[in-house]
Amino acid sequence: MIMKKRLITFLLAFFCLMCGVMNAQPDKVVKILTIGNSFSEDAVEQHLYDLAKTEDIKVIIGNMYIGGCSLEKHLNNARDNKGAYKYRKIGLNGKKVETKSFSLEAALADEQWDYVSFQQNSGRSGMYDTWMESLPELMAYVKARVPKKTKMVLHQTWAYDKTSTHKDFKNYKHDQDLMYKSIVDAVHRAAKELGVKIIVPCGTAIQNARTTPLCDCLTRDGYHLHKTYGRYVAACTWYEKIFKKNVVGNTYKPAEMTPEQQRHAQQSAHAAVKKPKKVKTIK
């Protein structure tokens, strides 16, 4: 009887041990590639790695950069396999390396990407037709070159400052609210049409942050994000949407940012991920 009990105890212990071994996973590395321009540079190249590192999340971030690049130009580059990009890659050590004259095909083959994101250039970001003229073919090109597990992402960028002098602000009658709503509408319509499940709502996060004391320091020229405050809001949005972790309370912040500014930025991002189509006043 005693031997039988010992045998049962041993078998149970062995079973539990084996379950633990089977369920144990090596440290996951999340790999994100953005096909973008200076707005993807603003969003993912600065603070996203540090936000992730603070929570022991391992991440590799790639950005295919051409300033002001539209979806149409990305598609033409793909068709011609042009080495037209600056490929900025942040590795596991947090160091950014830039390789010039890189092609989309080469970037897609460089890693087993978990996420690949697309965005329209800022002036056309709220014009739905310009998304659909190029994105379906561009997305098909990408899907043919990445693993089946790779998730497609749309990056919902932000409206210009109310006083912006950007030449394309006329597309929205120099009206920030109109531009914001147009971007939200265009991105969500494109996502629905193409079956994209993930939208990173940086535009809504920035709009939320504009209800806080950060409002006057979110851009550096009326459209590109401020290198500290605006970029931090965008990175917080990417962090919460991609990693599915509440960014509020993450301890990483740029040195020049106050705790109150950090709180406003994080809450702006969190609210945007929760309600990506609705602006919330952050107190």
Please place each PLM-identified region on the residue numbering:
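Bacterial N-terminal signal peptides that target proteins for export
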Residues: I2-L11
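Bacterial N-terminal signal peptides
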Residues: F10-C19
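Conserved catalytic region of serine esterases and O-acyltransferases that act on ester linkages
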Residues: K28, L218, G222-L225, Y229-R231, ...
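Conserved SGNH/GDSL esterase-like catalytic core that processes O-acyl groups on lipids
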Residues: V30, D42-M132
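Alpha-helical cap/lid subdomain in secreted, periplasmic
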Residues: K100-K227, E240
